[in-house]
Every structure is written in structure tokens, then in C-alpha cells.
């Protein structure tokens, strides 16, 4: 039987992007690959995974998608039930045909996929859309090998909030303060269901079980070495469209993953064309984070004080919080631009961009490294504090902003300090720019033919082919 891999991402932009790119690369290796999306996304968005194929299943919200759910918990519960049945039907419909599925690769947050695959007799391989470091923290925490230090005491002292304690001498993780750990290990926040999924996503995996990571060996060498003691962990990233990965621009000339759930603005790249090289601060906090009025004002004042042109992405749902009265002059004179969305890969690839003010979601972090853009890391929650720590301390590709403990926000002076640190041309800026450029070269080498991630993908292809032969 010929191998045929079914790729099942979580139906959100940040989770789909790397798995669409993975599906493309796997298919380019000569393995039949089908990417699964939802019926709502298939109808409302242009998903191009060529040379992989695309099939749609039900997530229980066929008419309105995630936005039609009463909340996150309701969506996930209904999705698990509907998608389990729909995915099983898709697999069963092909079971006796020449293009039957022989393996499933699924987003590690989609824990409902594993029992479906097992019931169908298919090997199931989790794909982590987060860093190896964050995944390792979740995994070791779930296994009782990592102890989280306590938070601040009631009297205001640190309450012993020192480094996270590892019960074994070498797990590949550096010592981290409580504030540098993924927040879900000590605070489930407003999404307890997602927090538990994060912590338990690899709990079932054993030493011989494949786990694929959207990272590359050179970036997270020690962490990967630690993970391979417990899992068959392989880095196959960065799953970012890059020239060395066979990337070709779309019909509109853009660098694209192939799945845009939000229509980007065109005007921002034309605005960037008018700016000198490395002169613009690009500011974006992803598709989920909501900064609030106070943080938006501090951010605006800090960016203005830094004196650099800036391109700021603010979701349409949060646009009413933008302090327009502060930005009126800057936007009128072309010193600033505020847009609801933009083609981020094109922006990061643009020579005018000198730094990326980012929440340090893993996709954004990996994209900045892949395009050699220094970062100002303003982590908010979940995996972001760990990524921000590594941007500054492990990779030297930017600086971390420190949140004011009393105000609970990043103050304007801290924003100004960080932007100037990576853009003013001093020693720190030169070092960050040099490191970012070196990581860009390593990232592209990793996915180029014969690179570390390319070799790991070839190893996975061999596993898939061997499994199909046995059927």
C-alpha cells in the first residue's frame, strides 16, 4: 500500500500556518498528503496546501466557525464530538481504496484525534506548534519531573520564587524563574480547558513514539537532546515559507503559508516602500491577545517617544481602544501607520523593518528569526514568557521588556528603552542584528536539502513508508 498521511491542524490561524507548510513539504517528498480543514474555513477562506490535497470535516460549527460558539470551552467540546465522527467517516470512506490513509499527523492540542486514529488502526503522530522548550516544560511538569516555584508571598516578598526545580540533573532545560515559565503550569487563566490540553498533550507518549516539532536542532539543541531521552522527538522546522524550502510567491507576489483566515491589508507594504532600510518598528501582538486601553496608551506613547516610524497591527475588534488622539499627527505625517491586519511574512522580509515588537507567540518568534529581524519581546501569557526569555538570553536576537509589577503593564519608558536598544545603532543593536542574521542563515540551512530538519523529515518519510508497506 502506498503511504498517505492525513494532517489535522487545530482550525486557528496560528496553528494552521505551520501545519499547512508541513503538509506542503511532506507532499514535496513524494508522500501523498491530505490536509484537513473545517467546512466553515473551506467555504470562507482560501486554503492552498499544494502539492498536498485538502479535505473538510465538521467541527460542529459549519455555518459560523469558532466565532459562532458561546465560548472556548463550548467550541472545544462540540468540536471534539463532531470532528471525531467526521474524521472517522473520512478515513472509513477511503479505507478500501488505493488512496487509503496510512498515518495521521495531528496538532498536539487536538487530543480527540488520537483515539480516532487508534480505533481506525492508524499510527498517530503529534505535531507541536510551540517551541521545544515550552513543550518540554509541559511534558516534564505532567510527568512530575519539574516543580514550579511558589509565587509572591502575601507580605510582598518573593515567597521563594526562585528557579524552577528539576528532579533530574539533565533535562535539557535551563533554570528558569517562575515568570519565565509558560503561565499555564501555574495559572490556567480564562481558558482552563486549553491549559489542561497544553499540559497533558504529550503525557501518553513513550520513548518510541514520534513527536514532531516546529523548530530546528541548531536553535534548541540541548532541549531536544533532553526530550529524546523520553520521546522520539524530531525538529522539522522552521515551518515557515522560505526561499530554501522551495517557496514561491503566490499570484499576488506575497510570501504566504497558503491559509489566510483574515484578509491582510495591502497598503502597509506600500507604506514600507517609502521608508529607509531598517528604520521601521513593526508592532503586532498576534490574533488572540487583547492589550486593553491602558497598555495600548503606554505602548503608543513609548513608540512615539522612541522616535522611529512604526507599523502597528491592531485587530478590528480592538480598534476602538487605539488612542487616536495620540497618533493623529504621526499618522498624518506618515511617521506611523495602524492597520487591522497585514501580510506578516512580507512585512518581516521588507528591508525597511528594523525590529519586531512582538508578544513572542512561537510563530511570530520563529518567523522573526527566519527573516533575521531583531525583536522587542513583550510577552503576555502562555508560552510567550519562555520564548521571550530565549530571544534575549539563549539566542541574543533581541531584548525583553519588563512589565511594571504595580501597574501590570509595560510602561512607556520601558517600551522606548527597548525599541531604542535594538534600533539606535549602538552596541546592543548591532549584537541583536548580527545574532538575528545568523539565526536566519541557520534556519534556512536547516530546511535546505541535507539540512538538519530536512534529514529529520526524510527519516519521518521512511517511517511512514515502512508503516504503509506493513498494511
Curated annotation (Swiss-Prot):
InterPro entries tied to this protein: UDP_glucos_trans, UDP_glycos_trans_CS
UniProt keyword list: Glycosyltransferase, Transferase
Location of the active site: 15 (proton acceptor), 107 (charge relay)
Signal peptide from the UniProt entry: none
Catalytic activity: (indol-3-yl)acetate + UDP-alpha-D-glucose = 1-O-(indol-3-ylacetyl)-beta-D-glucose + UDP
Record: residues binding UDP-alpha-D-glucose: 129, 344, 359, 362-364, 367, 383-384
Gene Ontology molecular function terms on file: indole-3-acetate beta-glucosyltransferase activity; quercetin 3-O-glucosyltransferase activity; quercetin 7-O-glucosyltransferase activity
Membrane listed as a keyword: no
Pathway(s) where this gene product acts: Plant hormone metabolism; auxin conjugation
Residues at which an anthocyanidin binds: 15
Enzyme Commission no: 2.4.1.121
GO cellular component, one term: cytoplasm
PROSITE patterns, alphabetized: UDPGT (PS00375)
Enzyme class: transferase
Pfam family, one: UDPGT
Annotated family: Belongs to the UDP-glycosyltransferase family.
PANTHER family listed in its UniProt record: GLUCOSYL/GLUCURONOSYL TRANSFERASES, INDOLE-3-ACETATE BETA-GLUCOSYLTRANSFERASE
Protein name: Indole-3-acetate beta-glucosyltransferase
Naturally occurring in which organism (per UniProt): Zea mays
